Amino acid sequence: MGVERIKAAFENGKKAFIPYVMGGDGGLEILKERMRFLDEAGASIVEIGIPFSDPVADGPTIQRAGKRALDSGVTVKGIFQALIEVRKEVQIPFVLMTYLNPVLAFGKERFIERCLEAGVDGIIVPDLPYEEQDIIAPLLREANIALIPLVTVTSPIERIKKITSESEGFVYAVTVAGVTGVRQNFKDEIHSYLEKVKSHTHLPVVAGFGISTKEHVEEMVTICDGVVVGSKVIELLENEKREEICEFIQATKQKEEA
């Protein structure tokens, strides 16, 4: 399915709620169980983090989750196997968030083959500059897997146009300077930034980094096409507060109907 499965998540004005889970945090059986829960709860897409020892874009919550996964001996191979098994039950799109090093260490051709086996629809590589994306972009295109672009508040218009013109899936618009993590509020210029990104791409635009309350979700989906919630989802899963995740999803759906 690949790119088409991601497109379907945004069809007919749908607003996407995209939770992030760290692959292997709590073990691979827990990963599968969380994927099933998020699918049943109504998540639009699930973003799965590949744990890495030098996660430069991750805030403290996601760093700790990655460290727990690595300390427990979780491997990229194991995460793929868990995804292969759970894909038989879960139909929503899978997007991997991985740094470049684990892809190259695994072998990029082999990594993409395993993505196909696991039904992965897209990949985000936060430390892969646009200028170097040919390292994996042609292989991903051939496999019909979207390489999801990231743009930031400081990205000039021309760069946003260039980055998004050849991309597929959706645009990940980073809403804060710095790393992921929980924030209290967003500056007014974030609204104009998101509107600017939307006006210069044919793809859906999803806001991420720092989104941690239902109010944030409601605010962001009035401007763009969806949200990624990472650190807060990890916290809620860890503390068994799943009903709050369902409330986030409901907040997204309500804006869809508004």
Curated annotation (Swiss-Prot):
Q: Which PROSITE patterns match?
A: TRP_SYNTHASE_ALPHA
Q: Kind of enzyme, top EC level?
A: lyase
Record pathway:
Amino-acid biosynthesis; L-tryptophan biosynthesis; L-tryptophan from chorismate: step 5/5
CDD domains hit by this protein: Tryptophan_synthase_alpha
One cellular-component annotation, GO: cytosol
Q: Which UniProt keywords are listed?
A: Amino-acid biosynthesis, Aromatic amino acid biosynthesis, Lyase, Tryptophan biosynthesis
Where is the catalytic site?
E47 (proton acceptor), D58 (proton acceptor)
Q: What is its EC number?
A: 4.2.1.20
Q: Which reaction does it catalyse?
A: (1S,2R)-1-C-(indol-3-yl)glycerol 3-phosphate + L-serine = D-glyceraldehyde 3-phosphate + L-tryptophan + H2O
GO MF annotation list = tryptophan synthase activity
| Entry's family note | Belongs to the TrpA family.
Subunit architecture = Tetramer of two alpha and two beta chains.
Biological role stated in the UniProt entry: The alpha subunit is responsible for the aldol cleavage of indoleglycerol phosphate to indole and glyceraldehyde 3-phosphate.
PANTHER family the record matches: TRYPTOPHAN SYNTHASE ALPHA CHAIN, CHLOROPLASTIC, TRYPTOPHAN SYNTHASE, ALPHA CHAIN
Q: What is this protein called?
A: Tryptophan synthase alpha chain
* Organism field: Bacillus cereus (strain AH820)
User: What gene does the UniProt entry assign to this protein?
Assistant: trpA
